[in-house]
Regions:
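A conserved beta-strand->alpha-helix junction
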Residues: 58-93, 122
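Acidic, carboxylate-rich catalytic segments that either coordinate divalent cations
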Residues: 260-282
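Active-site nucleotide-sugar/metal-binding loop of Leloir-type enzymes
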Residues: 109-114
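Short, solvent-exposed loop/turn segments at secondary-structure junctions
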Residues: 27-29, 51-53, 79-82, 123-127, ...
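Mid-to-C-terminal catalytic subdomains of enzymes
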Residues: 125-139, 171-263
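A mobile, often basic/glycine-rich helix-loop segment
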Residues: 128-169
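RNA-binding accessory domains that recognize and position tRNA/RNA substrates
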Residues: 1-18
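ATP-dependent adenylation/pyrophosphate-handling site
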Residues: 17-68
Length: 282
């Protein structure tokens, strides 16, 4: 069912035969790439690595592209221009630490993309409750009961699984989609996000945590996309900036007094300082 929904959305929104896919080693991007392939689109996969550090996501994207006979363009994101890149990210109104870290590689990917339409698996994580907080609350009845007791004890509002998921899709949340799209607009591309389609959302929001993730994380996708089996082990969810090492790279900016002008210990605080600084100056 999910495969058909993704295919239908791709067919209805992408008029060109060729499509770029930001491909990683995760279920979300692989599934939309397969859906595009099965919908008759010519897939051109793009993936990045930091300098000479080959990540799981990059290696798996290259492997899958080879097996599927997709064109694959590797993007090497430099690590020696970080201060200048920080200022570029500030101009894109990055606010949170994750905004800076997740938009950073896109500064180098989008200039290389040849196609008009760029396909991603954006938003899929929001349905599955793969965060630590979600799993502690919704992954089984015992954890739900513990969450209920905690809310009563601390006089907090208890969120249903759907309420928790809906919060993910708010305009200024959704894994920083708004900031990603600032880069998309700069390079005159069209960002296609099949997992944010209303038909896809309705289907997945009607599933509980167990239906979505048992016996394996994102099982409902794995079961529908049988081609995934030929790609070997597909690792569980890991955020882009963590799996690629971008977060570790950005921690080096703590030692840069020009960037870390308040002597902070965490990049979370440095990011906030810059957002406030720019907002005040505007």
């Amino acid at each position: 069912m999910i495969k058909k929904l993704l295919q239908n959305y791709i067919k209805s929104t992408i008029s060109d035969d060729d499509v770029a896919v930001l491909l990683s080693g995760g279920i979300d991007s692989i599934s939309v790439a397969l859906a595009a392939h099965d919908a008759g689109k010519k897939v051109h996969a793009y993936s990045f690595q930091l300098g000479n550090q080959t990540s799981y996501d990059f290696a798996k994207a290259a492997e899958i592209s080879y097996k599927m006979n997709w064109k694959f363009t590797p993007i090497v994101v430099p690590t020696d221009n970080l201060e200048n890149d920080w200022y570029r990210l500030v101009k894109f109104n990055c606010r949170k630490k994750t905004h800076f870290e997740c938009v950073f590689p896109m500064l180098y990917i989008y200039p290389e993309i040849k196609e008009k339409y760029v396909l991603t698996g954006w938003g899929a994580d929001g349905y599955f409750g793969v965060s630590k907080k979600a799993m502690m609350r919704y992954s089984n009845d015992k954890k739900w009961d513990n969450y209920t007791k905690y809310c009563k004890k601390h006089n907090q509002k208890q969120l249903t699984f759907n309420e928790f998921r809906e919060a993910y899709f708010l305009e200024d949340e959704c894994a920083g989609l708004k900031w990603h799209n600032f880069v998309v607009a700069k390079y005159n591309k069209i960002h296609i996000t099949p997992y944010l389609d209303e038909n896809v959302k309705t289907y997945l929001m009607n599933k509980d945590w167990q239906e979505l993730n048992k016996p394996r994380q994102k099982e409902i996708i794995r079961k529908d996309f049988t081609d995934l089996e030929k790609f070997g082990i597909i690792k569980p969810h890991l955020n882009l900036h963590l799996g690629s090492g971008v977060n570790k790279l950005f921690e080096t900016l703590l030692d840069d007094p020009t960037i870390n002008f308040k002597g902070r210990k965490r990049m979370m605080d440095v990011s906030r300082d810059w957002y406030k600084k720019e907002k005040h100056e505007v």
